[in-house]
Amino acid sequence: MFLPLPDDFHAHLRQGELMPGYVRDLVSQFGRAIIMPNTVPAMSSAAAIAEYKRQILEAAQDVRPDFEPLMTFKLNPNYTEKDLKDMMAVGVVAGKYYPAGVTTNSADGISDFEAVFPVVAMMEKLGLVLCVHGEEPGEFCLDREPAFIKRVETLAQKFPKLKIVFEHLSSAKAVEAVKRLPANVAATFTVHHLMMTLDDVVGDALRPHHFCKPLPKRPEDRAAIREAAFSGSPKFFLGTDSAPHQQGKKECPCGAAGVYSAPVAIPLLVQEFDRAGALDKLPDFIAGFGADFYGLPRTTKQ
């Protein structure tokens, strides 16, 4: 069986001396990827994004010189339409909504939901995609994603022409919400949420390398994710949320959230789709539906 060259619609590459290795791991498996903006400082200007893109392309040269990084900016209420157009000119395709404090490098995230509506309206006008980390701050950890569904529903209602990606779904309630929301709302699934429950994080033993945000949840939540992923619905596609951290930041008293899956994501997906008797659905999941939703041409490479 030959697979199309996959797209990853949610990847973290970090910064500094370790970044080139993370890039090489990613591009060994993927031809395109949505690059997350929660760096320090955040990706929030055309100049910073252009330089980050240059570094990524430089690191990719030895492995996949035609790799295409699809850039994003970190949403805040202060952008002008010119800012957005300038960022689009250097390769930005989406903005990322991080609620304040819910995940890595999100302390400067959104604390006033409606304050970003003017910027979101500009994004809708310009055809930018809104990617959402859907967890409600202050809720019990397993309830944060279900509690955020109302925010996505509000965005979909208020901005009907805006494409919204509810990222890395981890709950049956969120899966059902995406199914019933209009066609301008889609979702990504990670490999680890397809495979794990909370037992795999804190069940018989504490497994820090399985710790991520949003947390894997109950078996019935995983079952809903798997059913949707294997269904062939164009609303669901791959975003690995591959998130590298140094070993000392995972194996410590206060470990960082993130599963580093880039080097093994595609073999694991082949395994899981095969076990489910759904290998015929895998090409669209990894290299079709996401491109369609983002308005990109489907890859012709294998």
PLM feature spans:
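Conserved active-site and cofactor/substrate-binding residues in soluble primary-metabolism enzymes
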Residues: E17, G21, M43-A47, E114, ...
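Divalent metal-dependent hydrolysis catalytic cores, especially in the metallo-beta-lactamase
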Residues: D8-F9, Y22-A47, R64-N76, V92-N105, ...
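Histidine/acidic residue-rich metal-binding segments in metalloenzymes
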Residues: Y79-Y97, N105-L238
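His/Asp/Glu-enriched, well-ordered alpha-helical/loop segment
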Residues: S231-R298
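Glycine-rich loop at the start of a catalytic domain that most often binds anionic cofactors/ligands
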Residues: A46-Q55
